[in-house]
Amino acid sequence: SSADALQAARELALHTGAAVLVTGRTDYSTDGHQVVSTENGHPMMSRVTGVGCSMGALTAACAAVSPSPLQAAVSTAVLMGIAGEMAFEQSPAPGSFAVSLLDCLYSLSPEDVARRARILSL
């Protein structure tokens, strides 16, 4: 589980000075000092190719506009997770899900994020 990797993520963040995002059923973002968990997403996200690569690109975009690397990591987990939930509601099969995920990420609104985000600071 992603919780099993949390200590290693904290150590890596402290060692590098970067934020680390560990994905799974629960996503964990840490800067080594603070840990934030998010519980958005859908299991289908692990069954299609390219979600991790897309998260890397989204992290870079969030880092460009976020006040901290930790905030960028949390934003990435929440945005991609919510898009995954919405995509599965529209397209429950893997082929169409992959396309819907991109479409939902594109059309994600601030209202969607406010209504659906599940964030907990640990």
Region annotations inferred by a language model:
Residues 3-6, 53, 70, 74, ...:
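Electropositive phosphate-/nucleotide-binding environments in soluble metabolic enzymes
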Residues 18-21, 27, 35-37, 56, ...:
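Structural motif
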Residues 33-45:
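Glycine/charged-rich beta-loop-alpha catalytic/anionic-binding loops adjacent to active sites
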Residues 47-79:
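Short, small-residue alpha-helix embedded
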Residues 82-122:
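Charged C-terminal helix
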